[in-house]
Amino acid sequence: MISSSIIKNIKSECETGLASVAYYYFDYKDKDKQGVRGLLSSLLSQLCARSQDSYDILQSLYGIHQNGLEQPNEGDLFQTLKKVLELRHHGRVYIVMDAVDENPNTHGIPTPREDVLQLIKELVDLRHPDIRICVTSRPEEDIKMALERSASHDVSLHAQEGQRSDIIDYIRSVVEFDRNIQQKWRAEDRKLVVDSLSKNAKGM
């Protein structure tokens, strides 16, 4: 999976500098891996393992809910995540969400997919200078429409055998010449994106 390569490359960077990564794989076959509750819980557990301060924030949430006898609601989980992300010693934080399209979608009623897309928007709206969010998904119309309003950039990969070099050239040109990316992303971030996507371009 392309997200696995992205995560692997980010982890390599985290080993050499002040950065953190948290990731989540949605799964249409597992209800526990759909919607925002599992996502938020997983992101918190990964990020709170990084420092005592972030762990203390999580413990505070745990204490408020009778030391685990009650389940925090999704709003409480999100507010706790915001507090953790505000800790400066995390450095740059990469959040990777894979296969958003595997959240079910039923038109006309609230769905896990809509909740996830709203959460992504709220994370982007934090405008945190050290947060980088990567979302992968099939290009389904509702997801495209939601993410287009929040994404600083998107890369679409569709290839047949033999087109890998063309895709790599396309990725490199987008990352290197897009003015918005040039202004917002550091050189090492741009290189990380190119390397990660290029390694998995074949057959996408």
Can you say where each PLM-predicted feature lies in the sequence?
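Conserved NB-ARC/NACHT P-loop NTPase core of NLR-like innate immune receptors
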Residues: 1-204
